[in-house]
Amino acid sequence: ANLANADVVTDSPTNNFATLNPLDTVATNGTISEGNLKVVGGVYQTQIFPSTISASSGKWYAEFTQTLNNYPMVGVSDADLFFSLHASGGIRGSGAITWDLGSTNGRYYINSTSETDNAGKGSDGSVIQVAIDADSRKVWFGIDNTWQGSGNPAAGSNQIGVVAQTGPLIFFMRPESYQS
């Protein structure tokens, strides 16, 4: 009642960007630095760092520069998902799609129901890409501007998988050295 245009304040600042969230982690080990944009851990680290912003709708993109080639992982999950760690330190669950860049030829874990070998992997200096459509819950992964599996996030086709569950989506990573 009695609300005028002058009574509305534009969200400020605009163009907000997610960083890694040092306050919301699973397990132990790993170090975040450089304004929460860089994460480093030793071999077989099981620390999982989610992003500070979750996506309820729309199309979202994140990229990470891989600076070592040991056992890193990136992924997308339902924000309410409780992560479970399997024997090799991978992250998988009913609402997560994970790319294990450290396995011999790369491996995807999709909602705990399937695993795909020969998924590709980056190397030192590779730009690892993750795209999501929060409305359809589709996920795409890429390396150095090449989408895996002929994926096309712009067209909404050939996704790696569709995240189960229904909550907001978050990006996450497990170190073996990344910088976003």
State where each predicted segment sits.
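PRY/SPRY (B30.2) beta-sandwich protein-interaction domains
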Residues: 1-180
